[in-house]
Amino acid sequence: MSMRIMVVEDDALIALDIVGLLEDLGHEVVAEAADAFTAWELAEGDTPDLALVDIRLARNTDGGKLAQQLYDRLGVRSLFVSGSITDDFREAMAAINPVGFIGKPVTRRSLGDALAACA
C-alpha cells in the first residue's frame, strides 16, 4: 500500500537518503521539514498519511511534541527515526500509538519492515 509521507529530519543528507528510500519503496513524499514549526504548517495544509519524525529537530524543536500534535489534532501517526531513542521516550510516546521506532542509520530493510507493519 502506497502512503503519502511527510519527512521531518534536520540533517539534509539523512533526509535526502530517507526520501530516496521511501520513493524506492513506492511511497510518495508529500512534504519535508527540518523543524517542528514548518512541519506543522505543511501538515495542516496537506495532511499526510504518516509522518516520519526525528526526535531532535532544527530550531531546538522537539519531534516528540510535534508527533503528539500531529496525532491529537490531525490523526496522523508517526514513525520515529533517531540515533537516540530511549525506553523513556518510547513510554512517553506510547499514548499516540506510533508506527514504530527506527535507529539511525536508516536502511531500506528497517524502513520497509516498519512501514509494512502499519499497512
Regions found by a protein language model. Give the residues of each.
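C-terminal output helix
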Residues: D88, V106-C118
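Two-component/phosphorelay signaling modules centered on CheY-like receiver
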Residues: A12-A31
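Hydrophobic/aromatic residues positioned on beta-strands within the core alpha/beta folds
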Residues: V81-S82
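Acidic, metal-coordinating helix/loop segments flanking the phosphotransfer/catalytic sites
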Residues: V19, E32-L50
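Short amphipathic alpha-helix used as the core "switch/output" element in two-component signaling
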Residues: G64-V76
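Active-site residues of response regulator receiver
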Residues: D54-I55
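As written
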Residues: A92-I102
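Conserved acidic carboxylate
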Residues: E9
